[in-house]
Amino acid sequence: RQRQMCIRDRYQRVFVLDLLGTRDVETLLAHAYIDHLRELDETRPIKYYNFDFHNVSRAVGGMEGVGAELDRLHNVQTQRQYYRYTLCTQGKMLERQSGVFRVNCFDCLDRTNVVEGLLSHAALRDFFHELRRHAQEPVCVQLAADTSLPAALWQAHRDLWAGNGDALSNISTGTGLSLIHI
């Protein structure tokens, strides 16, 4: 409860993307989690969506299908585009993040890392797209002028994401991620 309240107090809006399955023990956990979320302050409800990762990946063709399915989910995309990111330059805030995704899973760091990586990838894609809205800002002009920068940022994003996910997996389970290459 305290953790959820802390996240909501810091980011104002929280969208829970629950990766728990829809059968066996994961269903019981998902229902308990939903009940827990309902008990929080109802004046600022937390949005919730169940995304049964394993069923989706089987139904739509593996990891690439999971990414495509997340892109198609209107409620996930609407929140992602609304929450955005914070962009500051020379002490001036151009964009302010207005929410956060809370990805919930049972015991599979791989599926959590894949879905969070897809959301992060989409946020970076949005960032590059939105640079045009701030074309008069020097930092945006500089970013847009350096044609090698997007490729370098994409590569850095992939490397950092994979390395961080692998490190977290090693800390919590003693083994690296099995899906680190994604």
How would you describe each model-predicted region?
Residues 61-99:
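Helix-loop module immediately N-terminal to the HCX5R catalytic loop
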Residues 12-21, 89-125:
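C-terminal, well-structured subdomains that either form a transmembrane helix-short loop-helix hairpin
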Residues 2-7, 182:
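Short, small-residue-biased leader/transition segments that mark boundaries at the very start
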Residues 25-34, 59-63, 113-118:
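A short acidic (Asp/Glu
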Residues 23, 35-39, 59-72, 96, ...:
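Long, compositionally biased intrinsically disordered terminal regions
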Residues 40-41, 77, 109, 113, ...:
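A generic secondary-structure signal for well-formed alpha-helical elements
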Residues 17, 49, 60, 114-115, ...:
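Intrinsically disordered, low-complexity regions enriched in proline, serine, glycine
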Residues 14, 20-54:
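Carboxylate/His-rich catalytic cores and anion/metal-binding grooves
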